[in-house]
Design a protein with these regions (language model features):
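Conserved N-terminal substructure of TIR/SEFIR domains
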Residues: 2-63, 75-80
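Serine-centered coil/turn micro-motif
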Residues: 28-29, 120, 164-165
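Short N-terminal amphipathic alpha-helices
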Residues: 55-59, 87, 98
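Short, acidic/glycine-rich phosphate-metal binding loop used to engage nucleotide
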Residues: 62-66, 88-90
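Short acidic active-site motifs
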Residues: 68-72
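Cross-kingdom TIR/SEFIR domain
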Residues: 74, 89-154
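C-terminal interaction surface of TIR/SEFIR-family domains
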Residues: 127-203
Length: 203
């Protein structure tokens, strides 16, 4: 697990990539098929970022502490250098986090999903990295194809062109900003709440 409490400041040494997606096996009710989202994360996303040493990769289930998760998730959606949202199965949390990211950051957001004829209307004009339905096993050749495409999307995102529909259609909106010091204070507050809850439960 990724422990934010041990970080003096999260965003100082390496670029951060936050992954918004479901984890484990989930049902895709659009086609009544079960999808193992951990396969695409481990074999494609994590595998690719193992070679992108300038980035630190974080997925929500790798964050320890319930209060820390809440604060750090919103902080990451604002401050992360890159967010990858895999919306396969139309996972509610991933869709919600993608919407927050689009509201907070004009650029550096990548959407990916398994191929489907049913793309949400509000996203059908966004650039989306799609990959084939791989069933229960993602073979190495197909994994390499997806990794190559994802790497291209990452390189393009570093140009910081606007990819948020909100900032595309309402260009006068100014994105919010938070300093590293303020972020550390929020994380410290969350840590204190976590310890207080633990003490109360333990009594």
């Amino acid at each position: 697990l990724y422990n934010f409490e041990e970080k003096e400041s999260l965003f100082v040494s390496r670029k951060i990539c936050f992954v918004a997606m479901g984890f484990g096996k989930k049902m895709d009710y659009r086609n009544s098929k079960e999808v193992d989202l951990d396969i695409i994360y481990k074999k494609v996303i994590k595998n690719l970022f193992d070679s992108l040493t300038e980035y630190e990769l974080i997925r929500a289930d790798e964050i320890s502490g319930s209060e820390i998760i809440d604060v750090s998730m919103y902080s990451l959606l604002l401050k992360a250098d890159l967010v990858i949202a895999d919306i396969t199965t139309m996972n509610e949390n991933a869709i919600y986090e993608l919407g927050i990211r689009h509201a907070l950051k004009p650029f550096s957001t990548i959407i990916m999903m398994q191929e489907s004829e049913k793309i949400p209307f509000d996203l059908n004009h966004c650039r989306i990295l799609t990959y084939k339905d791989f069933g229960e096993v993602l073979d190495d050749e197909e994994a390499e194809k997806i990794k190559t495409n994802l790497h291209s999307f990452i390189k393009a995102s570093e140009e910081q062109n606007i990819d948020s529909p909100l900032y595309t259609y309402l260009p006068n909106i100014v994105p919010p900003n938070i300093s590293d010091r303020e972020l550390d204070e929020l994380l410290d507050t969350a840590k204190t709440k976590e310890e207080t809850i633990s003490n109360l439960v333990g009594k």
